A protein has these predicted regions:
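H-loop/switch region of ABC-family ATPase nucleotide-binding domains
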Residues: 27-28, 271-272
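Conserved beta-strand-loop-alpha-helix hinge in the C-terminal portion
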Residues: 47-69, 291-313
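Conserved ABC ATPase "signature" region
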Residues: 192-207
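Helix-to-loop junction immediately C-terminal to a conserved catalytic motif
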Residues: 138
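Walker B catalytic motif
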Residues: 211, 240-241
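Conserved ABC ATPase signature
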Residues: 211-215, 219
Length: 314
């Protein structure tokens, strides 16, 4: 959910409480619940480990919350680090126009320059055209005739199918093998030690022989991300990759994105996750109504802009 939809959800929860209803929320992101909670039940390994009153839960320090793998109650307290990168080149997108109906374009971009070897956060409200841009960039939309130039070489739609790899928002469409390990091996038969290393870094090694569809939602997301990491593609596109992840696993994904960036690959991350953005992203691309609103590097000034977008809009 974007910030506006999160506000609507918070408003509805408040109404339900006023009506005397009991509301149980299984959640990793806690900031929007800060003023609503009456009780916090902390589960670990299938057991109730802690049971807090609202007052006691809100007294937990940022360090204590992090040790428990909890997202912070206060986004402003989350540590931020600038990750600007001097790009060695750019990825040029031209004539990216697309519409799902005969009405106005869902995507309306004449030209767009993306920094190579960056981790680019693609932000915007629901319906802004973020996922459409991702699908067009990856060559998944036949009616988008745009061209992408990388290192001076043009790639048409079909050629981009082997240039890019996309982790979709609903990863159930992408998990089709009999085991987690086979899912990664299907990406060009990478070396077994590489498969194990990636699974280990994403806390999935113990599930290597498990069927992907038997995993939890967050584990499935991490399997799809692991598959992208071993794909060997130059451009990775991830659509809401941390929506179901706790703090620890979000940080593991952030670390992997930084590693990819250091390898000279480019990642586009469609996200409403402020903590992920300030943990690893180097640039921001802001879309609304299918049009680019702004682009900026996440240097000190850029961090202030992204904080304003997420925190001041709460």
């Amino acid at each position: 959910l974007d910030m506006s939809a999160t506000k609507d959800l918070r408003r509805m929860i408040r109404i339900w409480k006023q009506q005397g209803k009991t509301v149980i929320i299984a959640e990793h992101r806690l900031y929007y619940l800060k003023e609503l909670i009456d009780r916090v039940v902390y589960l670990k390994d299938g057991r109730i480990e802690k049971d807090y009153s609202a007052l006691d839960a809100l007294k937990l320090s940022v360090t204590q919350q992090a040790e428990m793998g909890l997202r912070p109650f206060d986004l402003g307290a989350f540590p931020v680090t600038a990750h600007p990168v001097a790009s060695s080149g750019s990825i040029e997108c031209e004539n990216f126009h697309f519409a799902y109906t005969k009405q106005r374009d869902t995507l309306d971009i004449d030209s767009l320059s993306l920094p190579q070897a960056g981790v680019i956060a693609v932000i915007g409200h629901n319906g802004a055209g973020k996922s459409t841009l991702a699908r067009c960039l990856c060559g998944l939309e036949k009616h988008c005739k745009g061209i992408v130039n990388v290192d001076g070489k043009p790639y048409n739609r079909k050629q981009r199918l082997s240039l890019c790899y996309m982790v979709m928002q609903d990863v159930n469409h992408q998990l089709f093998t009999e085991s987690t390990e086979e899912m990664l091996i299907s990406m060009g038969e990478p070396a077994p030690d590489k498969v194990d290393a990636v699974l280990d870094r994403l806390d999935l090694l113990r599930f290597k022989n498990r069927h992907p569809m038997a995993l939890s939602g967050g584990q499935k997301q991490r399997v799809a991300i692991a598959t992208a990491l071993v794909s060997g593609r130059k451009i990775l596109v991830l659509d809401e990759p941390t929506s179901g992840l706790d703090l620890q696993h979000m940080k593991e994904v952030a670390d992997e994105l930084i590693t990819i960036q250091e390898m000279g690959k480019t990642s586009l991350v469609i996200t409403h996750d402020y903590e992920l953005i300030v943990s690893c992203c180097t640039h921001v691309l802001h879309l609304e109504h299918g049009v680019v609103q702004e682009q900026y590097a996440l240097d000190a000034a850029g961090l202030q802009r992204i904080q304003n977008f997420f925190i001041e809009s709460r």
